[in-house]
């Protein structure tokens, strides 16, 4: 499952096709072909995949990530990502990552927690809250404006 999700999110923009659309919710990945035939694959019961697109000036509204449709501003950019459990203060993610060609960085989080996420790029930082508590939790975070 992880490999499928990460492969979909890493599709280079030039390789995107209009014959496949995808969506990632907190519960499953849905792949739909040009004939509207859909295949659903459940996500792990203990994890949720969240795609985050930090930005400076341009973003889009999104709640459920579409690896074949969403486009973030900072493509192939180095970012520092820190995710902290808002209740315990435990650091869940503390990594130097690179945004994908679509401008997003993908993060696997444990289910059932409230977190604080911080992303830094070129000396600018954005911070947000993110929840993996509900079955309809957000999987696309596009509101992290770097300042």
Language-model regions, residue ranges each:
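Mid-length scaffold segments of soluble, non-membrane domains
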Residues: 43-93
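Hydrophobic beta-strand positions
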Residues: 31, 83-84, 98, 118-119
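A short, solvent-exposed beta-strand micro-motif common in secreted/extracellular proteins
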Residues: 113-122
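Short Pro-Gly-centered beta-turn/loop motif in secreted/extracellular proteins
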Residues: 106-114
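Surface-exposed loop/edge segments in extracytoplasmic proteins
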Residues: 88-96, 125-129
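Extracellular beta-sheet/turn segments enriched in Thr/Pro/Gly and aliphatic residues
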Residues: 41-43, 48-55, 133-147
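Glycine-centered loop-to-beta-strand initiation motif
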Residues: 99-107
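Extracytoplasmic low-complexity, Pro/Thr/Ser/Ala/Gly-rich segments
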Residues: 1-37
């Amino acid at each position: 499952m992880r490999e499928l999700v990460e492969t979909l999110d890493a599709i280079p923009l030039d390789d995107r096709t209009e014959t496949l659309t995808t969506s990632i919710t907190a519960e499953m990945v849905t792949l739909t072909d040009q004939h509207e035939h859909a295949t659903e694959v459940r996500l792990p019961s203990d994890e949720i995949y969240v795609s985050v697109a930090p930005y400076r000036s341009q973003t889009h509204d999104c709640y459920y990530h579409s690896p074949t449709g969403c486009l973030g501003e900072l493509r192939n950019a180095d970012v520092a990502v820190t995710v902290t459990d808002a209740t315990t203060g435990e650091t869940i993610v503390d990594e130097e990552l690179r945004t994908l060609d679509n401008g997003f960085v993908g993060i696997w989080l444990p289910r059932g927690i409230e977190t604080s996420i911080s992303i830094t790029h070129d000396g600018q930082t954005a911070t947000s809250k993110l929840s993996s508590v509900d079955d309809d939790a957000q999987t696309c975070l596009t509101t992290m404006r770097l300042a």
